Amino acid sequence: MPELPEVETSRRGIEPHLVGNILHYAIVRNSKLRWPVSEKIKTLLDEPILSVKRRAKYLLIELNQGWIIVHLGMSGSVRILPEEQPEEKHDHIDLVFRDGKVLRYTDPRRFGAWLWCEDLATSSVLAHLGPEPLSAQFNAQYLYQQSKNKKIAIKPWLMDNKLVVGVGNIYANEALFSSGIMPDRKASSLTEQECDVLVNAIKTVLTRSIEQGGTTLKDFLQSDGKPGYFAQELFVYGRKDKACLICGHTIESIKQGQRSTFFCRHCQHGEITD
């Protein structure tokens, strides 16, 4: 699933091609995504693109009339292509621009979304989101205050968008490894010092992934069609039964909330004793 670094990589890739350009028209080949494609998108004609932003894992494309809100779902990606490029099986949406370029949305599993909103303040999908992880608002004091009396395990807690947005499974695993914190500890067990280390680890791993164009494990492609290269820098995610790159001990895995969690008993400390 594309997480925050992949969405931010996509935003940075498409922004120079969209902002200041004129959306000539939209082609919707398949409306059956996670939610039906908003009818308004199908009717857009000759609309200038004012900005391309990101909130959590949503791409926000600003036009005079409102906003296109894009979620990449489990397997979605957006690419900039020439208008004459033939569409393929899973190419569901094109935004065709006056300069002959196309923003093409590809989504094999169709769990993504293309929504329309006149005012972001009224958008139900953007309501109740926590702070951005790379913002000053997300800091050790905030995380420590939020952790008090929380009996939930740390890793699924970090993945709650009401706490902080965009820390998906890959990056939660990697940040906890970097912090030396076991993923099944209760959130309430975190000390102020551990919160400081953990916040810094989250910011570092997300920033590094963005610099590498995100993580491609299967479907994700950058806007130029290239994969993300952060997969080559993963310490624990997807490395069950392999040697830890730091200490040589075996990487183990458990299930937390139907998600795979990866850890090293030697480098991380906390609850797991089996």
From Swiss-Prot:
PROSITE patterns: FPG_CAT, ZF_FPG_1, ZF_FPG_2. The active site is at 2 (schiff-base intermediate with dna), 3 (proton donor), 57 (proton donor), 259 (proton donor). Gene3D superfamilies: 1.10.8.50, MutM-like, N-terminal. Monomer. Its cofactor is Zn(2+). Its EC number is 3.2.2.23, 4.2.99.18. Belongs to the FPG family. Coiled coil: none annotated. Transmembrane segments: none annotated. DNA binds at residues 90, 109, 150. A zinc finger (FPG-type) spans 235-269. One of its GO terms (biological process) is base-excision repair. Binds 1 zinc ion per subunit. This is Formamidopyrimidine-DNA glycosylase. Involved in base excision repair of DNA damaged by oxidation or by mutagenic agents. Acts as a DNA glycosylase that recognizes and removes damaged bases. Has a preference for oxidized purines, such as 7,8-dihydro-8-oxoguanine (8-oxoG). Has AP (apurinic/apyrimidinic) lyase activity and introduces nicks in the DNA strand. Cleaves the DNA backbone by beta-delta elimination to generate a single-strand break at the site of the removed base with both 3'- and 5'-phosphates. It catalyses: Hydrolysis of DNA containing ring-opened 7-methylguanine residues, releasing 2,6-diamino-4-hydroxy-5-(N-methyl)formamidopyrimidine; 2'-deoxyribonucleotide-(2'-deoxyribose 5'-phosphate)-2'-deoxyribonucleotide-DNA = a 3'-end 2'-deoxyribonucleotide-(2,3-dehydro-2,3-deoxyribose 5'-phosphate)-DNA + a 5'-end 5'-phospho-2'-deoxyribonucleoside-DNA + H(+). One of its GO terms (molecular function) is damaged DNA binding. Keywords: DNA damage, DNA repair, DNA-binding, Glycosidase, Hydrolase, Lyase, Metal-binding, Multifunctional enzyme, Zinc, Zinc-finger.
